[in-house]
Structures are given as structure tokens and as C-alpha cells.
Amino acid sequence: MSNDAVQRSVLPIPDRTGVGLTTYDAKDPDTSYPPVRELRPPAGAPNVLVVLIDDTGFGASSAFGGPILTPTAERLAADGLKFNRFHTTALCSPTRAALLSGRNHHSVGMGGITEIATSAPGYNSLRPNTAAPLAETLRLNGYSTAQFGKCHEVPVWQTSPMGPFDNWPSGGGGFEYFYGFIGGETNQYAPAIYHNTTPVEPERTPEEGYHFTEDMTDKAIDWVRQQKALMSDKPFFIYFAPGATHAPHHVPPGWSDRYKGKFDAGWDQLRKQTFARQKELGIIPDDAELTARPPEIPAWEDMSAEMKPILARQMEVYAGFLEHRPPRGPPDRRASRP
């Protein structure tokens, strides 16, 4: 369908109908009909990839002066923009609902996480039909759409394999393909996975090296390759939301061990170092002042000798979980990937 002829102010975009007399005469050499034209986005419409990392603070990633190495984020930041006043709701479901709809979270029924929904307006975890999700808007404009990873926007009473699926990614959420889990968290070694609305088992066991972040990444790579092979002229929208770094902090030991001893000085020293690096990077103003440590958080020097190694190890595991970069696939498939 010609982009110039498409009226995109109403969704779904009305079907194009032929004007004039329709005849069905096999003997008439002049019998013809309007060609079937598949809907496409406007010329030059880009591919869109949205990555949402869970429970990651402003000062965690090295891209923002944090102590945790995130080289991919650094490369993206070097070629793009970094925002230092990008606000979230500081809650899981509300932030996701706002991001995926472009609306205030109360406007889409997500004033709190789905597990504490009530019948109060703005808090029932039900997105109204008048609020179209971003993925649905793009899909109805000719995009291919897919979601991978965590989905925490489904009302708790609708999370079974029997639905209803109006608030699921591949139901009413606008995503043609979904591979991930429903809810706030899942075991990263033995996750409860859905393919669209069907429960599926991981292809490997933890003993065979399975990890959900690597699995969902592999599925996303496969989906993009299929998309480019079969519909290279059609742009795509991918929403990629791993379970990291929300609890449980499940990460292969090789990743968490990279940070052995890195946090032994404690959080008081760590926050000062991060603050200084953020000034060096220009992320915060030179005259910014470090906020006082909240009284609810004890000073590191007040922690007992028994607790310090435990708390430092928790920080090491978290750091490894954030840095964890999934491989291209299991060993028997890596050779086929560039």
C-alpha cells in the first residue's frame, strides 16, 4: 500500500477498497481488480530495539560512572545520548506499563505492581481499551513486533495458560511474538517460560549450562535473522527485558567471581568513588553535592566482621549479574553464528 495513500490517524488503518463497478467475466479481457498491497510503515521507518534492565541504579553501570563493567552500554552511549534526568516510577509494573504505552502509569491502571492491584481507579492493573500499547500502534502501521524476557503487566488473575490474554504481550499487547516469563521474577536456571501463551520447558538443564538470559538472547537473535531473511523490507520493534538484575541474582560463578574483592571497602567508599567518576564523565554537574546516606542504611564501618564478607559477596554477585553478557548460543550452534 502506498505510504502516500495511507491515512494513519485512525487505527486499525481502514482497508483500501476499490471504487467502481466490479465484474467477474472470464471472457472480458479488460476485467481487472486493484492489486493487493501489504501495509508498510512510512518510508525510512527505523528498526526499534528497547532494552529494559531491571533494578539497576543510576550509578551501577560503567556507562554512568558505576563500578560494574558494561562495555556494550558504553559503546551505545558513545554513539548516542545519555540522559541524566530520565525518570521511572521506581516500581516494576508501573514503569513498564508507562514505557509500553507512553502514558502516565495511573492512566493505564498500573498505580502499583500487579500483585497489589485493587478496584480503585488507576490501580486495577487493567489497561483500558482507549490506551493503545506502543507495540500495537507499530504493528498496525506495518511493523513486525516481538518481546523477549520479563512481562510484569498481566493482572495476577489472568496469568494462567487459560488467559484471558487481553493483557498478555502476544494477546492484546501488540506483540506478534513473545518468549519470556510472566510476573515479577523467575528462577534464571529453571524459569517458567511462555512461548506466546503456551508454557514451554527450557531446551537444556542447568547442568548443561542453561541460563535464561542466554536463552532469551538466543531466541531474539534467531527472530531477527528470520525477520531479515523473510521480510527484509519490513522494520521491526523488539522489546528486550531480561530478568536481570532483579532477584533472584542467578549468574554463572565465572561472572560474579570477576568482582572478587572489588567491594570489600564497602558501600560508603563505593558511592564516593562513583560520584567522582560521574563528575569526570560530565553526567552530573561539577558543583553537585553527594547526598547524605539515608539513616535506614547503616555505615559500612558499623557492620560486623562476620557480615562484611557476606554483604561484599552479595555485591559481587549483583555486579556479575549485570555484566553478564550472554553468548551467541549453546556450543553446538556457535559455529554457525558470525
Give the label of every model feature segment:
Residues 1-338:
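Formylglycine-dependent sulfatase
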